[in-house]
Amino acid sequence: MKRTFQPSNLVRKRRHGFRARMATKAGRKIINARRAHGRKSLSA
């Protein structure tokens, strides 16, 4: 059986990266929430 997690840095950046987050209203909300919380890392 194939495992569900097949790591790929390209897919990781495209799906969860900073620019992917900024592309949608909901994504910008996530970034702002993480900024307000004082996260060291905002996105993948």
Curated annotation (Swiss-Prot):
Gene Ontology process terms (BP): translation
Cross-referenced PROSITE patterns: RIBOSOMAL_L34
A Gene Ontology cellular-component term: ribosome
GO molecular function, one term: structural constituent of ribosome
Pfam families referenced in this protein's UniProt entry, alphabetically: Ribosomal_L34
Entry keyword set: Ribonucleoprotein, Ribosomal protein
Listed InterPro entries: Ribosomal_bL34, Ribosomal_bL34_CS
Family annotation (Gene3D superfamilies): 1.10.287.3980
Family from the record: Belongs to the bacterial ribosomal protein bL34 family.
Protein name per its UniProtKB record: Large ribosomal subunit protein bL34
